[in-house]
Amino acid sequence: MMTGKSAPRRLSIFGSTGSIGQNTLNVVDHLGGRENFEISVLTGSGNVELLARQAKSSGARLAVTANDRHYESLKSELSGTGIAVASGKSGLMEAADRDVDWVMAAIVGTAGLAPTLAAARRGADIALANKECLVSAGDLFIAAIREGGGRLLPVDSEHNAIFQVLEENQRHAVERVILTASGGPFRTASLRDMADVTVETARAHPNWSMGLKISIDSASMFNKALEMIEALHLFSLRPEQIEVIFHPQSIIHSMVGYTDGSVLAQLGAPDMRTAIGYALSFPRRPNLPVERLDFAKLARLDFEAPDEVRFPALRLARLAMTRGGVQGAVLNGAKEVALEAFIEGRLSFLAMAEVTERVMDDLAGLPQAAGMDDVFAADREARQRAAELMTLAIAE
């Protein structure tokens, strides 16, 4: 009997010009490129030249810039290639409407919400790197995944680690999940020292190479706070089942504790291609050119309980999870405004959490989200309130 080669898997990469998107294309190339995969859509924002190069080299059918102002530039870059071009919110929704098997959802911020939910409802497997989908709209996003019938494959290294060691037929026996954090550049800093943190010192992550905003989020532990809320929705957990531990070597990416006292951990060198490759190849494991652990050279693995006085973002995550509703969206929206103010020199490092908590308290009475409009409204209110609080503080 003759057996034909299976058709290439159809992929869309939302946010292809970012770090996750570039690493995804790298993994696709390593796993056979066009022989095994068909790139349907690539989306980016301001880096038009890179987006155009990616579209040409991958053979993408559609290239989308999220910024309408860059439409003509992208169209000019891709003139004569046969690659379709679109832009703005409508372009992102056109991208989401493509019939594909797998979507890398790596658009940063709330801009990624609508297209990722739409792709989920169409039934594509979603490799999720966008935090806002679960932090701001967790219940709605999980419902969209169930409606479409696709699989939700986490790409954050911590959630991907849990996904790898979570025994599907033993979910009832999960006692806790333990998210690891390096502790960032201020793991051992005093509260007094943290009051004088600058943007340059905050962006210097000890183990991972990341963009400016996510580096600062990691330094303040807001990134870990968002990951706690994500884990709640991803794995159907209760807030009290989610723990955070500092692990400065970043070798253990997360752990799952079971009712019999066993703890299963996923270890590996800090390289995002491992999580991306696993999400792309699931349920199989790919052969990737990443560093192999040499346990003889590791020497030691250290762990410390985080100090929530110096890192209050972790406490705010628990507060948001306990309150529920749109508190995740409020936390994220307020934090984004505070982060911008810190980068611009208008707010201190420690004050980011103070502003965020004030906004969460002020908007604790907002109703449960019935749809995405409610999520976006909560996000807007949080951002407006955060801006007002900072204006009042400056005036005083």
From Swiss-Prot:
Its EC number is 1.1.1.267. It holds the Pfam family DXP_redisom_C. NADPH binds at residues 17-20, 47, 130, 132, 211. Gene3D superfamilies: 1.10.1740.10, NAD(P)-binding Rossmann-like Domain (3.40.50.720). Mn(2+) binds at residues 156, 158, 227. It catalyses: 2-C-methyl-D-erythritol 4-phosphate + NADP(+) = 1-deoxy-D-xylulose 5-phosphate + NADPH + H(+). 1-deoxy-D-xylulose 5-phosphate binds at residues 131, 157-158, 182, 205, 218, 223-224, 227. Its cofactor is Mg(2+); Mn(2+). Coiled coil: none annotated. Keywords: Isoprene biosynthesis, Manganese, Metal-binding, NADP, Oxidoreductase. Pathway: Isoprenoid biosynthesis; isopentenyl diphosphate biosynthesis via DXP pathway; isopentenyl diphosphate from 1-deoxy-D-xylulose 5-phosphate: step 1/6. GO terms for molecular function: 1-deoxy-D-xylulose-5-phosphate reductoisomerase activity; manganese ion binding; NADPH binding. InterPro entries: DXP_reductoisomerase, DXP_reductoisomerase_C, DXP_reductoisomerase_N, DXPR_C, DXPR_C_sf, NAD(P)-bd_dom_sf. NCBIfam families: Dxr. Catalyzes the NADPH-dependent rearrangement and reduction of 1-deoxy-D-xylulose-5-phosphate (DXP) to 2-C-methyl-D-erythritol 4-phosphate (MEP). HAMAP family: DXP_reductoisom. Belongs to the DXR family. PANTHER family: 1-DEOXY-D-XYLULOSE 5-PHOSPHATE REDUCTOISOMERASE, 1-DEOXY-D-XYLULOSE 5-PHOSPHATE REDUCTOISOMERASE, CHLOROPLASTIC. This is 1-deoxy-D-xylulose 5-phosphate reductoisomerase. It comes from Rhizobium johnstonii (strain DSM 114642 / LMG 32736 / 3841).
